């Protein structure tokens, strides 16, 4: 997706600012993000991935599930159990790395209407929420994986960039 910012863009390494207006503009942004996420076959998308420094994310775990927007999310609690899974990212296309994350999470946020929302999630949903909140804090999956996997991923990204430049 040409809208999604790629690895190396400074906005992806910056902490996003809180949302303070819950209006039609925000609701339009949520709808746009949901559409881009779906078009890219993603399960989550954070505003910084579109170059927007706002603490806003959308996610959907399962094709039949509704899209959920979390505005200004804050992790209240994570379970002690962690699990390693291979994660990918729309901002780092073609790369998947192992990331350890808590299996359970509780997050307090607001929805796009401004209503308070408490989300208790496990498994894939918990992982997606934590991944997207990382984006709001300027953290990427390459920051959460092993040094070896990070090196290999960066090498693969450089090779893809070189191939793209040669094709152009």
Language-model features, listed with the residues they occupy:
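Positively charged
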Residues: 1-168
